[in-house]
Amino acid sequence: MASLKLSPSSPISISKVGVIPSSKKGLSFLVKAEHHSSSSSSHLQDKCQRRLIVTFGVVAPWISLLSRAPLSFAAESKKGFLAVSDNKDAYAFLYPFGWQEVVIEGQDKVYKDVIEPLESVSVNLVPTSKQTIKEFGPPKQIAETLIKKVLAPPNQKTTLIDASEHDVDGKTYYQFEFTVQARNYTRHALGTITVFNGNFYTLTTGANERRWEKMKDRLHTVVDSFKITV
């Protein structure tokens, strides 16, 4: 990953993202936790968190079985993976062969392993007036806010492991790694976010901590494969 590059913080206004463990439908996330900052910027970051909470409360529904229009599928582009390309929303990514599509209200696309429900990938889009991801702030700040406010339940402990910035084809992406500790398991996860054409894109993927060493290379492939296609 590229080294962390900081930029001025700014209020975030994005929607709730994620997946909640279910016996049949696998994973979906909701989050809450504290966002720590220096005293000199506490007022601005408090405002940022309030906007997050308000927006999340409006947009975040739970799992449903509503039908969704399918994305177009490309041929397998890497051994052990299948490719998905959404022409309407202009993004593409790879997911491990054998994962199945599930429908979760509020998520644009979700694939999961039917045997290991914590192994999944989801993509979420919400409107934004920002032009680039950098306008929201530096990678670590934005990742911590997303993890604590969006990507884990409020009763679970979250830990940000790493956050970085990289550019691909002139577009800036933030990538981050984190864990979410529940009572009976810990999920080790990866995420990538970017802004394009009035949308804030979030892709998250992960696995049970006990399977992290086995799955981490595949999950990094998933995160690294996410690209805006325009």
UniProtKB/Swiss-Prot annotation:
Q: Does the keyword Plastid apply?
A: yes
Similarity annotation = Belongs to the PsbP family.
What GO terms are given for molecular function? calcium ion binding
Q: Which GO terms describe its biological process?
A: photosynthesis
Q: Where in the cell is it found?
A: Plastid, Chloroplast thylakoid lumen
What does the function comment of this entry state?
A: Required for efficient repair of photodamaged PSII, but not tightly associated with the complex.
Q: What is its main location?
A: plastid
**Phenotype upon knockout?**
No visible phenotype.
Disulfide connectivity?
none
One Pfam family, please name it.
PsbP
Q: In which domain of life is the source organism classified? A: Eukaryota
An example GO CC term for this entry is: chloroplast
* Organism from which the protein derives: Arabidopsis thaliana (Mouse-ear cress)
Key word rRNA processing present in the record? no
Q: What UniProt keywords are attached to this protein's entry? A: Chloroplast, Plastid, Thylakoid, Transit peptide
Write the protein's name.
PsbP-like protein 1, chloroplastic
